[in-house]
Amino acid sequence: MKVKKSTRSKVSTACVNCRKRKIKCTGKYPCTNCISYDCTCVFLKKHLPQKEDSSQSLPTTAVAPPSSHANVEASADVQHLDTAIKLDNQYYFKLMNDLIQTPVSPSATHAPDTSNNPTNDNNILFKDDSKYQNQLVTYQNILTNLYALPPCDDTQLLIDKTKSQLNNLINSWNPEINYPKLSSFSPRPQRSIETYLLTNKYRNKIHMTRFSFWTDQMVKSQSPDSFLATTPLVDEVFGLFSPIQAFSLRGIGYLIKKNIENTGSSMLIDTKETIYLILRLFDLCYEHLIQGCISISNPLENYLQKIKQTPTTTASASLPTSPAPLSNDLVISVIHQLPQPFIQSITGFTTTQLIENLHDSFSMFRIVTQMYAQHRKRFAEFLNQAFSLPHQEKSVLFSSFCSSEYLLSTLCYAYYNVTLYHMLDINTLDYLEILVSLLEIQNEIDERFGFEKMLEVAVTCSTKMGLSRWEYYVGIDENTAERRRKIWWKIYSLEKRFLTDLGDLSLINEHQMNCLLPKDFRDMGFINHKEFLTKIGTSSLSPSSPKLKNLSLSRLIEYGELAIAQIVGDFFSETLYNEKFTSLEVSVKPTIIRQKLLEKVFEDIESFRLKLAKIKLHTSRVFQVAHCKYPEYPKNDLIEAAKFVSYHKNTWFSILGAVNNLIARLSEDPEVITEQSMKYANEMFQEWREINQFLIQVDTDFIVWACLDFYELIFFVMASKFYVEDPHITLEDVINTLKVFKRITNIISFFNNNLDEKDYDCQTFREFSRSSSLVAISIRIIFLKYCYAEQIDRAEFIERLKEVEPGLSDLLREFFDTRSFIYRYMLKSVEKSGFHLIIRKMLESDYKFLYRDKLATGNIPDQGNSSQISQLYDSTAPSYNNASASAANSPLKLSSLLNSGEESYTQDASENVPCNLRHQDRSLQQTKRQHSAPSQISANENNIYNLGTLEEFVSSGDLTDLYHTLWNDNTSYPFL
């Protein structure tokens, strides 16, 4: 039957494929273009054509059945949720599933183009599945014919039966590896077997994360064409499901790619500065991790080296069996640095008491951890009132708090190390309670490296002690049992908060955990973890219930935190890391199967949203307190309530950011998936506005500071969405954002006026500076997008704001000034010595092994200079600064990052060279670098990049060169 031609000259609707190809669509289902191209014809809900003839039979493609949502009702528990999203998701998937389309199904009327058919690829290591395809086509044709019949009960029964058979086929369709072919297969040494196993006949591009993807060219290309082409697709730091993948190297590459499109813009300088700042912050975060590693591995020596003190004798102060003995002199040297009587006044411990306990390492670990916890509590109290204290008193106290914080953390790390290897002693409740207390502090100051290492120990010890299993509680007294439960669930809660931020694989197996929940949960009708997950979504418990109403605010917050932790753990286990969605076989399955899985992912998101909303209902009293002011509630209650509200919001943003990586992996058509994800993005946009309003109205600037750790992730996720999805930013959004950051600037000014240079290593200062820098860069990105959207430059932007909010125009000007106090922390250490990326070491390490392997196999291109390889491998080049003044006169094309031999960016390299030799040596080094750089794999010399200083990059840096050097075309439009 011929397809009826449209009599209209224009159509008001178009299918997804016609819109993408920018060709005229007939507006009918299926359109003639999709029949010709042999592809799935999909109309999004808002583009669906009006049905003209329900009895018309269409060739080779199933007719869309009448859509009915009579059975889709929003339950009473989710009336306050955006049910429109859920309904539209169901409509979309109902449309896709009822059509039973597959991109590999042969058309009865049109021969498919096999010129680029991946089916012919000899690299496919799976068995042929034509049998399943033929069965699928058979069911397609049956359903097509059934839908063309007039509706009746018998027809519907046949349709249901056929669908059931089709579902059974889909569920049993599992790709099988062709083991004989695999055994005889000889992959190129540059690519792993896993890389080749992704080769399939259904698609030639598979996303691992939002910003990294596999293509069939990876197994066909002889050589990589950029630095990232030589590295794993999944970044070890950001992993599979990090909500901030946009901050990874591939994410930054996408940002640069977007800016290359705006090279003719009047905002070019601003965009180049922004890229530089992002790379600098990337560098700074790696340095933060490195410093954390140094602090915990050699705490005493590291501290004493910083203050230029060297102990003379070494007498053991630890247990005899310790593999890492402490030194009396080292410990005493650090203890004597504690500011007394200040420490005694806030912790209750004197220097004499500490020295008297040196013989007992476990006792010292408990004491210094108690001191550290008490110090954090008093420090928070001081900061909450610091803005009302006289300057002199404020400055002295602040200095004492900062210096003693670093000292106490040093002692805690030292005694953690020395007690770690006494397995019989650490497998006790006493030790775990100490460790949990230290973990809470680590989490508060965001010491990621130390937190992760201690968390692994805590999880391992508590699991070995049976804290997660009910069987180990039989026969013990209830007080001890509840103490064990409290420790376990605190460790569990901390671990899930860590997952929420990073998207990592959990250390805890959710399916092997069956101990009882704490008493407050049991009183509410939740006996254990499994029952809580089953009941929480439909719980009838109201905020006015005595079981919730009689809880103190702190206990209600503890309930909310553990409740959130449990649904996060379940989502990670059952969705993000579920083999059903993430196995290698799933990646090579046909479109229709992945669409089914994608439907389940959206159902899981909705289930998570329902549970999170129910937790918000249960803890509504906390939300009420957070929106109040002192003196209606104590200041500490206001702070803790605000932190919980921020954590609740942060969780939703993190989950959506994480699951977008999974959506990217399963998706077939970016436009269709983006249409679905945009619904969540719009909701996030509105919630971001609400969070801004919340932070504007909180009682003190310190509350904003306390919420900053949660707020930074929310803001960065939003900034990445602004860059990808271009939501409409209003001037009101700009104003509210500036009002929030104005409160942050008060804290920055406080540090600038009261912090001594010797206290720059204070964890509180470093963490605040890192968080505020990330927020500042996110805001700058959003402001740039506003300028692009409005087609104005920074001067017009400032003038526009000045007309409505003159008091904020100066702050907006600061955001566009890289010499501003806003960016001082990021750029201070590179004012003299130039820009030094930590990724230099990453590049160096990767290329070392790369060229060593090539040398072993004899695959090094003959360049007539073997010393080039040895210099790269040994990394013995002298360390000088290469930021010469002449560099600004020509584009920074030839990269020299790897062999530049630059000093750490925290040190001015010129200090190591006599003044009269500096210029000469710099020129010599520049010449050496240009001659000694080895030939890259792609036979070009642009695979390694040195940005130079900010001024050099802005005046002479080439965005296109930078992009092609590190990324080339290894970025694409992500699914956000």
Swiss-Prot record:
DNA-binding region ranges: 15-41
Any one annotated GO CC term: cytoplasm
Keywords: Activator, DNA-binding, Metal-binding, Nucleus, Transcription, Transcription regulation, Zinc
GO biological process, one term: positive regulation of transcription by RNA polymerase II
InterPro entries the UniProt entry points to: Sec_Metabolite_Reg, Transcription_factor_dom_fun, Zn2-C6_fun-type_DNA-bd_sf, Zn2Cys6_DnaBD
Gene3D superfamilies per the UniProt record, alphabetical: Zn(2)-C6 fungal-type DNA-binding domain
Chief site of localization: nucleus
Pfam families for the chain: Fungal_trans, Zn_clus
Residue ranges, compositional bias (Low complexity): 112-123
Segments for region (Disordered): 104-126
MF-aspect GO terms: DNA-binding transcription activator activity, RNA polymerase II-specific; RNA polymerase II cis-regulatory region sequence-specific DNA binding; zinc ion binding
PROSITE patterns in the cross-refs: ZN2_CY6_FUNGAL_1, ZN2_CY6_FUNGAL_2
Subcellular location field: Nucleus
Function per UniProt: PDR1 and PDR3 jointly control the transcription level of both SNQ2 and PDR5.
Note: Present with 166 molecules/cell in log phase SD medium.
Protein's UniProt name: Transcription factor PDR3
Species the sequence originates in: Saccharomyces cerevisiae (strain ATCC 204508 / S288c)
Gene name for this UniProt entry: PDR3
